[in-house]
Amino acid sequence: MKRVAFVAILGLALVSSKAKAEDSSPAQVQKGAELFALNCATCHGTRMRNPQWAIDLRTFPKDAKPRFIDSVMNGKRNMPPWDDVLKNEEVEALWAYVSSGDRD
């Protein structure tokens, strides 16, 4: 039973990850940019450019939304978890920004 539930949840995550940045509202992308500047730019670089030692998020796969959310919420390698700082809708806004590639 647990395996069926896991597969169902994974399937939903994969389907939702297919949403493109264009599906995000401009307001959500803007909110994500603001959150990024406040919380992420120190390590990932201003506007995702020239990260000092963290991953260059401009190269993050656009079809890896579940991986992005898991990394932000639970941390990964040198990145701390942000689950006690960011709300789910804020992580969604960050994804909208990151997956948009900051074209400005």
Q: What are the residue ranges of the model-derived segments?
A:
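Gly/Gly-Pro-rich "capping" loops immediately C-terminal to redox-active cysteine motifs
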Residues: 26-33, 45-76
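Short cysteine clusters
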Residues: 40-43
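Axial heme c-ligation environment in periplasmic c-type cytochrome domains
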Residues: 51-60, 73-104
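Short sequence/structural segments immediately N-terminal
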Residues: 29-30, 35-36, 86, 103-104
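Bacterial N-terminal signal peptides
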Residues: 7-13
